[in-house]
Regions:
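Extended substrate-binding grooves/exosites of carbohydrate-active enzymes
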Residues: 1-174, 181-189
Length: 189
C-alpha cells in the first residue's frame, strides 16, 4: 500500500494477524512480508554477510492486478465447496466483511499508477549510495494521533541523520552494520 501506516509498528509474516489486515492494506513501514519472502532489509543483510551472493530478486517493481497477497485467499478466486473457500469464508465472516476489495498485489516499489511508494526510497538509498537523499516517513499530519507514539523511519543514502520535530532535535542515529533504515521508534506525535 502507499501512504498507509498502522500502529503499533510490527514486523512479521503477512499471514499472521498484522495491523491493516481487516481493511485489506499493508503498512507502508514495509516491515511485513509474505511467508515465502523477506523484507528488503533482511535480503540486503544476507547479501552483505555473504559477498558471494551474486544479486537479488525483487518481485515485483510495480504493483499489478492479481495475486492480492496476503488477501489471495478471499472468495473471489476460489471455487465454492472447497476447503480453501470454506476457510476464506470463515475468516471473512469473522471480520464481518461481505466484499473483498483487494484485487492487486502489494509487492511493488511503485503502485499501480506508477507513483513511488515509501519502499522506493529505501531501495534508492541502497542501490544509489552516491545520490544524496533522505526520505522520512510517515506523513506528519495526524491531529488524531496527538500524544501517541508514532515511529519515524528515515531512508537515506547517508550514514547518519538527525531528526528534528518542531525545531527540537530527537537525536542523531547512525546506521549500524546490517541496518538500512534509521528508526526513531519512540516519537510522540
Amino acid at each position: 500500500s502507499r501512504g498507509e501506516y498502522f500502529f503499533p509498528v510490527v514486523q512479521g509474516d503477512l499471514n499472521n494477524n498484522l495491523p491493516g489486515k481487516g481493511i485489506f492494506q499493508i503498512s507502508s513501514y514495509d516491515l511485513s512480508y509474505p511467508g515465502w519472502a523477506t523484507t528488503p532489509d533482511q535480503q540486503w543483510e544476507m547479501q552483505d554477510k555473504y559477498p558471494g551472493v551474486f544479486g537479488e530478486f525483487v518481485w515485483t517493481g510495480f504493483d499489478y492486478i492479481g495475486e492480492p497477497t496476503p488477501y489471495g485467499g478471499d472468495l473471489t478466486g476460489l471455487r465454492p465447496g472447497t476447503r480453501a473457500y470454506d476457510r476464506a469464508k470463515e475468516l471473512l465472516d469473522r471480520q464481518n466483511v461481505t466484499e473483498v476489495p483487494s484485487r492487486s498485489s502489494y509487492f511493488g516499489i511503485l503502485d499501480l499508477a506508477g507513483f513511488k511508494k515509501d519502499r522506493f526510497w529505501l531501495y534508492q538509498s541502497k542501490w544509489r549510495p552516491e545520490l544524496p537523499m533522505a526520505h522520512i516517513l510517515p506523513h506528519w499530519n495526524w491531529p488524531e494521533r496527538k500524544g501517541q507514539v508514532t515511529p519515524v523511519h528515515v531512508y537515506t543514502s547517508g550514514d547518519e541523520a538527525e531528526l528534528f520535530i518542531n525545531g527540537k532535535s530527537l537525536g542523531k542515529k547512525k546506521k549500524g552494520q546490517f541496518e538500512y533504515r534509521l528508526r526513531w521508534d519512540d516519537v510522540v506525535y
